[in-house]
């Protein structure tokens, strides 16, 4: 039974579609928007539309950006021999905040997960292989999460990349098993990078 009008119910439903937002939090957010000055709702709506219109994938690393190539790919002070492969754009943010890595990135936009119907061809693996063709990259660091999907993805990539003659390493497991990179602190991330080893 609905206790509020159609537009409010729709707003609650839309908030509830976001990850980590349950029905009660969605309701709380909706009523916060309703009880705030109109500028809050207008600013939120404008930001949502703007981000959907202006953000795209970098043609080199597949990270989300408003310019192509992205600022990281344009940075010539980075080590062009290193490529760190991560699952999501938020993992790039975590790595950059840790300030321990100065190579380039490749964002897969997910991990292989048969249970969720995510196959290798659903990820940006084709773009990764294309990137490795120029021969500049000497080491690929697999920084997929240390959960089942991340390990599956890392093993798949290691088997795919080994024949290309590139060194394939996996970040060390200072990252707790089953956790996501974005939640790791800077020191843990840096130690995991330093302790990486050959993989596959």
UniProtKB/Swiss-Prot annotation:
Spell out the disulfide connections.
none
Q: Name one GO molecular function term.
A: zinc ion binding
| Gene3D superfamilies given in the database record | 3.30.60.80, 3.40.1360.10, 6.10.250.240, RecR Domain 1 (1.10.8.420)
**Pfam families per UniProt:** RecR_C, RecR_HhH, RecR_ZnF, Toprim_4
ZnF C4-type residues are 58-73
Looking up InterPro entries in the UniProt record yields: DNA_Rcmb_RecR, Hlx-hairpin-Hlx_DNA-bd_motif, Rcmb_RecR, Rcmb_RecR_Znf, TOPRIM_dom, TOPRIM_RecR
Q: Extract one GO BP annotation from the record.
A: DNA repair
The protein's UniProt keywords, in alphabetical order, are:
DNA damage, DNA recombination, DNA repair, Metal-binding, Zinc, Zinc-finger
Work out whether the entry's keyword set contains Zinc-finger: yes
* Toprim domain boundaries: 81-176
| Physiological role | May play a role in DNA repair. It seems to be involved in an RecBC-independent recombinational process of DNA repair. It may act with RecF and RecO.
Q: Which family does it belong to?
A: Belongs to the RecR family.
NCBIfam families annotated for this entry?
A: recR
Q: List the protein's name.
A: Recombination protein RecR
Protein's gene: recR
